[in-house]
């Protein structure tokens, strides 16, 4: 069937909630993906920050094949070796103490909120359970994580949302101080806001937040669903800041393309939880954990010697050079290979034109071109994208 036929079938049978681009992708390898007609694209979105090791990395594929032939699912009534190995790996890498596995970033964030509230209530004896999150944040699409995501375009139509959430501006420590009450249980922050437009936390800000949480006995949650797993050049974005969270959430790139989420937390908080307090049927299944173990090992190699950080700096420099030619580019910002270029207008047409030229990119918050390439990206890939972007911008300028 043709690409158009498949698109027509999707429109007939699938729930129409995605504003998809008009392309049917059928194959991926490394930086490249191919559509049903055989056209090649360079992927600078990586499945929205999922394919950090590239498409179908041989080590991840081999791990999936091997595990699929052995044991796929048992439930968490039983012990499984890949889950135990992955928990150990994430604890060692993060410096935290225990891990819980689920299936997505939204589930991980929902779990983090539950764990924080249980700890503050049961151990600290403080009721209220209020969570403070940031404007421009995105924490998920469940009702609870929507309540932590203060954007009308996501929340509208889904009221009433669960109570107990408060919002403050990102990078504003004074506003955060004013928002804290004796009901505050946790502060939830993305060290680099992704969906909100690639906003990087100030170093002094995260340190001040950590001090504030220590002083007030408040749980600090870092949502690294998008900015974690090597995306910023460190395994976890918080490593750039010398600030450790009480709870860390992960997903997206953790599984190398296979759905898996994780909550990694300190022992003090873990002690507040007992059998039956939380759970999942599929979370931490052998297949997902085997894929994740392979993915983490590959990422460890990719981020060595600041390679990802240097690629990110190169990418940002090349984008900044375009500002001199095109005054409608307001700002370029990012950390590692999590990069945004803010425009003075909606970037949806830019995304479509780049697709025509063979590049997958994204626009978030209406005006921010978002670049999340696999960590295997090379300078020649970046140069090719910049040249294509230059051509598109030139057409617009005319």
Curated annotation (Swiss-Prot):
GO cellular component labels: cytoplasm
Binding site for N(2)-acetyl-L-ornithine: 141, 280
Needed cofactors: pyridoxal 5'-phosphate
Residues bound to pyridoxal 5'-phosphate: 105-106, 138, 223-226, 281
Annotated catalysed reactions: N(2)-acetyl-L-ornithine + 2-oxoglutarate = N-acetyl-L-glutamate 5-semialdehyde + L-glutamate
E.C. code: 2.6.1.11
GO molecular function: identical protein binding; N2-acetyl-L-ornithine:2-oxoglutarate 5-aminotransferase activity; pyridoxal phosphate binding
Cited InterPro entries: AcOrn/SuccOrn_fam, Aminotrans_3, Aminotrans_3_PPA_site, Class-III_PLP-dep_AT, PyrdxlP-dep_Trfase, PyrdxlP-dep_Trfase_major, PyrdxlP-dep_Trfase_small
PANTHER family found in the cross-reference section: ACETYLORNITHINE AMINOTRANSFERASE, MITOCHONDRIAL, AMINOTRANSFERASE CLASS III
HAMAP family linked to this entry: ArgD_aminotrans_3
Protein name: Acetylornithine aminotransferase
Lineage of the organism: Archaea, Methanobacteriati, Methanobacteriota, Methanomada group, Methanococci
